[in-house]
Design a protein with these regions (language model features):
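Secondary-structure transition/capping residues
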Residues: 10, 58, 65, 81-85, ...
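Flexible, polar/acidic helix-loop-strand segments at domain edges
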Residues: 1, 6-7, 11-46
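Compositionally biased, intrinsically disordered low-complexity regions
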Residues: 4-7, 16, 23, 63, ...
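Extended, hydrophobic/aromatic-rich amphipathic alpha-helical segments that build helical scaffolds
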Residues: 41-74, 91-103
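A broad, low-specificity signal marking well-ordered, structured residues that form hydrophobic/aromatic
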Residues: 25, 71, 110
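Long, intrinsically disordered, low-complexity segments
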Residues: 36, 41, 75, 83-159
Length: 159
């Protein structure tokens, strides 16, 4: 079936090779392996937590110096020095840093919604632009069949 415990195998044979598929070079892999390679990515990272805290500080009118320190800690780790540090951060800089730091980690959609840029995304199909209801997902038919008290989210066809 491809499932092993709580993990999902890429192929039933476990035959995953360095050359297979698209691969982000963000995480290195053991080049001595010829198969059964691990290619997991992290769900939460310290950098993500720092950036979330910095965002919360800015959104709540908190300590900008602390928010700036947190973002710069992420940048210093990424660049290896303080040459790219910010003097001060705002939501736009934090959103940009999240794009750099968390690329390929499944944060983009929710980040764009939270920062109010989802409907402006250049990859969004023209027929969906300006339809704010698409910021939330529809309730699935399966969920509704389980609980018929659910009402479909606005903008989507009713059950």
């Amino acid at each position: 079936s491809g499932l092993v415990g709580s993990e999902m195998c890429i192929r039933d044979r476990g035959d995953v090779n360095q050359e297979d598929g698209a691969r982000c070079n963000k995480w290195t892999f053991d080049k001595s392996l010829t198969n059964a390679m691990e290619n997991d990515f992290h769900i939460f990272r310290l950098a993500d937590v720092y950036l979330m805290k910095a965002e919360c500080l800015i959104r709540t009118g908190g300590n900008n110096a602390e928010a700036t320190r947190l973002v710069n800690a992420v940048r210093e780790r990424a660049y290896g020095n303080s040459n790219h540090n910010y003097a001060s951060v705002d939501l736009e800089k934090i959103a940009l840093e999240r794009k750099f730091e968390l690329a390929w980690e499944c944060h983009a959609r929710q980040d764009n919604i939270r920062f109010g840029t989802f409907q402006n995304a250049r990859w969004l199909k023209s027929e969906t632009k300006g339809k704010d209801y698409m910021n939330i997902f529809p309730i699935s038919q399966d969920a509704w069949q389980t609980n018929q008290n659910l009402k479909q989210n606005p903008g989507y066809p009713a059950f």
